[in-house]
Amino acid sequence: MSVISMKQLLEAGVHFGHQTRRWNPKMGEYIFTERNGIYIIDLQKTVKKVEEAYSVMKDIATEGGTILFVGTKKQAQEAVEEEAKRSGMYFVNQRWLGGMLTNFKTIKKRIERLRELEKMEEDGTFEVLPKKEVIKLRHEQEKLEKFLGGIKDMTEMPDALFVVDPRKERIAIQEAHTLGIPVISIVDTNCDPDEVDYVIPGNDDAIRAVKLIASTMANAIIEGKQGVQTEA
């Protein structure tokens, strides 16, 4: 049985691309037709590409690897966080801080600081400090949690990135390429598919479309992890 059906893709509006004037000619092979000034994505190709990405994700998880979900645009934030958590993976859904991968040493120091603040809160340090200082520390903690909360358990480089909208997440993709980390991404008709290792042609602007594809990728990870457990 297919991991995703044409019916599911249609219902979620995955086939709706961008206006024809905002397109990248390199996406031509994934476009089925044009309707009312909007490109319609060929869902038969999307099904094949989802299956390909599913297999990659599943294999990484079976090998005990990790995947970083990246989606900072409003339509992606919730799905990226939920599906990463559901599959026990990491996520960035607020803002990609330059160097999150290429300068991971520095990011790790910020994560250590976040852990330190969490410990201070847990062990009662906050209760004995002056109120003004606690307010300042809490503010620092909240800020770190907001931007780094989804990767605070990530101890080393991920084995792949799952990205929603490569145009929006260009810096993340550049960093992944620099480090030789493969990128799996939902690619809309206005994006450049050459920047992505595993293209999933689809609507990256509709919450339901993003949720459907992100949850399918999370399912792949969960299935892959079960493979690890059964082999163990």
From Swiss-Prot:
GO terms for cellular component: cytosolic small ribosomal subunit. The keyword Ribonucleoprotein applies. One of its GO terms (biological process) is translation. Keywords: Ribonucleoprotein, Ribosomal protein. Gene3D superfamilies: Glucose-6-phosphate isomerase like protein, domain 1 (3.40.50.10490), Helix hairpin bin (1.10.287.610). GO terms for molecular function: structural constituent of ribosome. PROSITE patterns: RIBOSOMAL_S2_1, RIBOSOMAL_S2_2. SUPFAM superfamilies: Ribosomal protein S2. Belongs to the universal ribosomal protein uS2 family. This is Small ribosomal subunit protein uS2. The gene is rpsB.
